[in-house]
A protein has these predicted regions:
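Beta-lactam-recognizing serine transpeptidase/beta-lactamase-like catalytic domain environment
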Residues: 1-17, 23-188
Length: 188
């Protein structure tokens, strides 16, 4: 009897935060761009951007672009990318995107994971979210879950591919649950 309602998981795009890091790492792994056994310097990421090539390059010192830091000012020192994932390092994501995972490849993976388009699910209104790749800081920030917005439904769908050997499952609405042996309805 509800005439108007908002389904927050499907209708309300949000910046997902660190849960996006798993998607960024999955894109690097699947595309063959993951830097196994390499390390990076955590703490703060300063960079330059070459507009002609679209290349983001880490640099020391200040630049015209905003520096990106690990949360709460943490500085983990020099660590592996594996440890960067464990510690949820924003700088690790920036280094991954600047040095190993090209922005175009990252964007293609975000699209393949189903972000920024409505989820094909009957009976459920949903939003597409917003891809913000306007500036280099937006590309980097999207990698650790800021700047671009997605829905919780899109995130669940994307993670289904990670947990299901690369096969993404489309969410669906369950009308009822039926016991396969007795054919009795368990719940409707």
């Amino acid at each position: 009897d509800i005439e108007s309602y908002l389904n927050i998981p499907s209708d309300s795009p949000y910046e997902p935060g660190s849960v996006m890091k798993g998607i960024t790492y999955a894109a690097a792994l699947d595309s063959g761009n993951y830097p196994y056994n390499e390390e990076f310097r955590a703490g703060t990421f300063s960079y330059t951007y070459d507009e002609s090539t679209g290349k983001i390059s880490r640099t020391s010192g200040s630049t015209a672009y905003p520096s990106i830091s690990d949360a709460l000012g943490n500085d983990f020192g020099t660590i592996s990318y594996d440890e960067g994932f464990i510690r949820s390092s924003n700088v690790g994501i920036c280094c991954l995107l600047a040095d190993h995972l090209p922005a175009k490849t990252f964007e293609e993976y975000l699209n393949r994971f189903g972000f920024f388009t409505k989820v094909d699910i009957p009976f459920v209104a949903n939003a597409a979210g917003v891809k913000n790749f306007s500036h280099p800081s937006d590309i980097l920030s999207t990698g650790f879950g800021q700047s671009s917005s997605v829905t919780a439904l899109q995130m669940v769908q994307a993670y289904s591919a990670i947990f299901n050997d690369g096969v993404m499952m489309r969410p669906y609405v369950v009308e009822k649950i039926v016991d396969s042996y007795s054919n009795e309805t368990i719940k409707s």
